[in-house]
Regions:
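Aromatic-rich peripheral "rim/lid" segments of glycoside hydrolase catalytic domains that contact
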Residues: 2, 26-86, 91-136
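Active-site cradle of extracellular carbohydrate-active enzymes
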Residues: 2-8, 14
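His-enriched metal-coordination microenvironments in redox/metal-binding proteins
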Residues: 8, 17-20, 90
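Short, conserved beta-strand edge motifs with alternating hydrophobic and charged residues
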Residues: 12-16, 45-48
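Surface-exposed cleft-lining segments at the edges of enzyme active sites
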Residues: 15-24, 61
Length: 136
């Protein structure tokens, strides 16, 4: 990698993770990319994690399950070559998510892109984060 070859002090790469709930993640490609970054001695950080569910149909519980699955797919792919040491979500509660102000759902329901709902109660998304950070 040119920067490392030039002696630039590069220690980590943050993967901005604004996901679309209706789109599956290329877990194989992501795992290979992360493994390559780590082979250069770089730490891989998950940053700006949220999941836009505006195109999903179903109950909030059904949407939450799909959102959690996308997060689990992301973190599983990243963890194939080493532990996930840092996860930064782009907000903590659905109540204050930028997604609700930018991408309104056609059914007028609020988006549910973050680990805590609008009442600050944990959702399955939070369980996935806990699964990957319990030993961090």
């Amino acid at each position: 990698m040119d920067l490392l070859d030039q002696g630039v002090p590069l220690h980590a790469v943050g993967l901005q993770s604004h996901l679309q709930a209706e789109l599956e993640i290329d877990t194989h490609g992501l795992a290979e990319f992360v493994a390559e970054l780590r082979s250069w001695g770089l730490e891989v950080l998950v940053t700006e994690l949220d999941v836009d569910d505006q195109k999903l149909t179903g109950t909030p519980a059904e949407r939450d399950a799909i959102v959690a699955k996308r997060v689990d797919d992301l973190l599983t792919a990243i963890s194939t070559s080493g532990p996930v040491r840092s996860i930064l979500t782009w907000g903590i509660s659905d109540r204050y998510s930028w997604i609700n102000g930018t991408f309104a759902r056609k059914d007028k329901q609020p988006n549910r892109p973050l680990p805590l709902d609008g009442e600050f109660k944990p959702k399955p998304f939070m369980d996935v984060i806990s699964k990957f950070t319990k030993d961090a």
